[in-house]
Each structure stands twice: as structure tokens, then as C-alpha cells.
Amino acid sequence: MQKPRILFITPLPPPVHGSAMVSQYIKECKELQEEFNCDFVNLSTSRNIDEIGKRSIMKYVRFIGAYFITLWKLITNSYALCYLAITCHGLGFLKDAPFVMLCKLFGRKVIIHQHNKGMSSCVDKKPYKWLLPLVYKNTKVILLSWHLYPDIEKVVKKEQIIICPNGIPEITEKEPHFERNNNVPQLLFLSNLIPSKGVYTLLDACKILKDKGCQFVCNFIGGESKEITKEVFEKAVEERGINDAVIYHGPKYGKDKISYFTNVDIFIHPTSNDCFPLTLLEAMQYALPIITTDIGGIADIVQNNHNGYICECENPTALAAAIEDLLADKQKRVEFGMNGYRLFKEKFTLEQFNKNISQIIKDNI
């Protein structure tokens, strides 16, 4: 019997970010390859982090190219289902919406995998108040967490929702070292240098800790952005007088990134705009205690006082207090790290994600 054919219209790396990485995992998923004939169209018009949010001729060319590739695939194939990972607000939504409508025009079933949030900020504005209901009507919508549902509840009914948490590959079958032996505790921030990820909040917290005489080194890893270049970051560090406590290492990948995860003591992600950060799952895999914020679906990942601390968003004082508590209590760091590792193994492996996404596709063709 011929396998059902599925069309995946998703952003693929580069650039490397959460949604693109999940799409890449889906593209490589053996369970899907065994059950279905899978076609992919790259929805991303950016090829590096610097291009995100900027207009260029090449981005228009890529958009038009992706649209006509999608049109050709819909004409020449009979798809049992179209899976789309789209932006739900702003110009990104206006760019992605035509792909959903094209699939609907051909009478195909549609699943939308929602990796972002922000619909509530534009749902009452033109043209979104007309377009959003059109795009999401008669679709199934995959959310990463029920905590994200309030953002889309004006447009999407609860009956349309399917919950599927993200998962990441397991780097090693061996258990990580739960106890680190650094003479000076090492903190790790791993994200692109974007203000909404809490870069300045963490720098301010570092200043508070340094002024108190706390001993630590805060390691920043991630690519530069248009808002925060290396020069801007280093100036911010100098202005706060924390040059001896903060190091920017630039972006790191593969073994280079792993070496930081295996050697630091505390992972910090003071974000103000996230859905379900993969970087937190990475930290849990390496048994790191986490300090983060209650944004998006993070409460499903980090349980306060169990595998980390949840702090108030954009509050350097609260962040500094949480860091100071873990700096002073090595046993608590180990305990939180062990709890996080067990939670990761139970819920957030790529193997579990692949099983979930494959079953969702099967149930909806």
C-alpha cells in the first residue's frame, strides 16, 4: 500500500533558532519517514540571524520562490495533510498566511505547529482580525504547552488544540556529572545576544552580585544581533565595572558548546520573550540547575524550587538573589541538577518528541 504523502512547510536552518531546529528534527525523524512520504518547503526567508527582521531583495526572492514551489507541489501531488510552522503575528504572519490559504485552496487538511506567541497583541487590529480567523479556521493547532493557549484563545478553540512539548537529541547515554568542582562558580548564558533574552537583566544582576563581593564568572555564549553586537556588549560590561566577572565567548557549536555545559555550575535564561526554549532542555540534559522566568511554556520545563528558580521578568534584583542563593549552596545546585536531568529523560528527549509528532500526524490524516 502506498504511504500517505505529507507536505511540511517550515523554517529550516540556517539561521539556527528554536523553530528551525525543531523543523530539522522533524525532517530527520525516522518514524515519519517510515510511515509517510514527506516533502519539505523551507519557509524561512532569512539565512542568518542578522537578516531576521530586516527587508531585502533576496528575502522577497526567497518568499516568491517558496510560494511557487509550494504551489507546484500542491498541483503535482495529492497530500493527505499539510503541516505548517508559521508566525502568528506581525509581518511574519502576513508572510506565512498565504501558504496556509494556498493549502486550504487545494482542499488539504492543515495542521499548524505554533512555536511562537504574540497573536493576542494584534488580534483586534486590522488586517489581523480578519485574516487570523481565516487562517486558523478548520485547522488543528499544535501548542508546546497549555500555558500558551491564552495568547490564541480569541481565535482558536480548545477543541483544535494538540499539546506536544519539544524534545532534543540525547548527547550521550551516560549520566552527566551531577557535581562540579570549580574553585570559582561558573554561570552560563546561552542564547543569541537579543535584549528580550535578558542580556542586560543578567548584566545588571552580575553588577549587584559583584558589589556584594560574590565570587563567580558569568559566561555568555551566542551570536551577535543587530541590537547587541560584541562591541555594544563589551561596552555594557565596562559601564557596569564587571569586566573581571563576565566573559563573552561568541557563538559555540558542537563539542565547543558541550564543554561549557559540562563544566559550568548554573544555567541562566532570564528571558522576556520565549515559548519553549530548547536551551533549557539542553541545560537539563547536563544536570544544570536553572534560573529563568515564567514566560510562555517555561513553567512546564522548570519547576520552581525543584530543578531551578523562576524569577520575575526583567528584575535584576530578583535574579541576583536567586543566583546568590545557588552560589552559596552547592548541595542545592546538585539536587536541582539531578531533578532536572530526570525530568528531561522522562519528558523532553527527541525520541519522545518523535513518537508524539508521528502519532499526531497519524491521528489527523
Predicted region positions:
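Conserved donor-binding/catalytic core segment of Leloir-type glycosyltransferases
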Residues: L7-I9, F178-K197, L202-C206, C218-E224
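Donor nucleotide-sugar binding/catalytic pocket of nucleotide-sugar-dependent glycosyltransferases
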Residues: L132-K174
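Short hydrophobic beta-strand element within catalytic cores of glycosyltransferases
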Residues: P289-T292, V302
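Conserved acidic donor-binding segment of nucleotide-sugar-dependent glycosyltransferases
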Residues: N304-N305, Y309-P316, D325-Q331
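Nucleotide-activated donor-binding/catalytic signature segment of Leloir-type glycosyltransferases, i.e.
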Residues: E231-K252
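Glycosyltransferase donor-sugar binding loop
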Residues: N42-S46, L190, V217-E231, G250-P251
